[in-house]
Every structure is written in C-alpha cells, then in structure tokens.
Regions:
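Boundary regions of SH3-family modules and the immediately adjacent low-complexity/disordered segments
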Residues: 3-8, 13-14, 20-51, 57-64, ...
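Catalytic nucleophile-His microenvironment captured as a short glycine-rich beta-strand/loop
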Residues: 168, 173-181
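Aromatic- and glycine-rich peptidoglycan recognition patches
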Residues: 94-96, 148, 156-157, 180-221
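Hydrophobic residues embedded in beta-strands of well-ordered beta-sheets
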Residues: 17, 81-82, 176, 184-185
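Conserved "cap/hinge" positions at secondary-structure junctions
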Residues: 11, 76, 172-173, 188
Length: 221
C-alpha cells in the first residue's frame, strides 16, 4: 500500500492490524504503528521517489522517500517546500490531488528499468498488475489490483491487429501495457525489471519460455 491510502481495520492482534484498502478492497496486514489518523489529501507525488526533509531546506534531507502516487495533506508552504505531518517535501514533486494526465500512462517511463518485485507497488520494486493499477490510481480512476480482476474489469476486447496505445495484453497471471503499434512495457518477472519490448518479440518469448499464449487484449478507455 502507498502512503496516504485509506483503509478500514478489520481486526487487531498484539502487533498487527488486518485491514481492507478503500482503493480496491484488497485485504492484508500492517504493523500497528504504521498508520496515522484519516486525513483528506490535497496533493499526490508525481515523481518516482520524492525526498523527505526534516526542515524546509535541501540540507535536511532524511533517509526516506515517498513513492509515486502517494498522497499527502499540505499543512503549509515555505519557499519551494510543502509541509505534511511534521515533515517537508519539495512542491515540484507534487501535483494537486485532482490533477489528471491527458494520457493516463504518460509517466510510465518513470518505472522503466526499475526492479520487478512480486507484490511490489513502489520505486523499490513493482509487479505487472501494480504497474497498471498505479497509473489509474494516480489519475483518480479505479483499477483492480490483480491481473485476473483487471481482465474482468476492462470489458472491451480488441484483436491484436487493432491495438492502440494504452491497451492491455493479458496472459495467465501477467499483463503488459501497449505503448504503440510495435512496443509494450511490462514488469517482467524473468528479467527482474520493467522493460520496453517489441510486441511480437514479447508474445513469442512468453510463449516459448512460459508456454503461455495471449488470453485477451482489452481497451482501457
């Protein structure tokens, strides 16, 4: 989950809370101390990883970052910095909470070459379905977390010869984002990173190495 995501606590144990995310109804566990009271976010992180500062000064950088699409409540602004909770972040690393990109995947190259991590959803590692969901979330649109649920959610089926930018190609347990008639991008487990590939090459490679054929291609808009 990301900083600023809202959730409901389902149950508590000594050190853990079982929660359900409001974003996609995903259920999981977090450490009790890892959350704060509900706040209404005013801004969201628009860079891959935004540095956090103790004071509104570039000399007071902490060893912490907020990942892309995290949400904050801006308490005040001082120079080029914005205060959230008791920390500071550069204003240039944020967008207003209602901001939307004209092209939902326009910032996708932020994750190019980044580490593949099953279950990951941030700059330290991300999986294929999170790469899709994250950009819908950033643009204030719903998208399920898992590949099978994304396949069911996006209804409009497309033939390979009719693909367009922002279409999604689905295999069993895997999804890729179409960038153009010839290119796609995906968080690719076997290579352990987010890669741009030729579409035909990717289809053949996945069929050869994983024995998987395309299940469907879906339009997202």
């Amino acid at each position: 989950m990301l900083y600023g995501e809202n959730f409901t606590i389902l149950s508590k144990s000594k050190n853990w809370c079982k929660i359900k995310l409001h974003t996609d109804n995903y259920v999981g566990f977090i450490i009790k101390k890892k959350f704060a009271k509900l706040f209404k976010p005013t801004h969201k992180v628009s860079v891959l990883a935004a540095n956090i500062y103790r004071k509104p000064s570039s000399r007071d950088k902490q060893n912490k970052k907020l990942t892309f699409a995290s949400k904050v409540y801006a308490k005040e602004k001082y120079g080029s910095f914005i205060k959230f909770e008791n920390q500071w972040i550069r204003a240039k690393d944020l967008k207003p909470i209602n901001y939307k990109d004209e092209n939902i995947f326009s910032k996708i190259n932020l994750f190019k070459g980044k580490k593949y991590k099953w279950g990951g959803k941030n700059f330290n590692g991300i999986d294929c379905s999170a790469l899709v969901q994250l950009f819908f979330n950033f643009n204030n649109k719903f998208c399920p977390r898992d590949t099978k649920d994304q396949l069911n959610y996006f209804k409009k089926k497309i033939e390979l010869q009719n693909i367009m930018k922002n279409d999604l190609i689905f295999w069993r347990g895997h999804v890729a984002i179409i960038l153009s008639k010839k290119k796609l991008i995906h968080a690719y487990g076997p290579s352990k990173k987010v890669l741009i590939m030729n579409i035909n090459y990717a289809i053949k490679k996945i069929e050869k190495t994983a024995n998987l054929k395309i299940i469907s291609i879906r339009r997202t808009n």
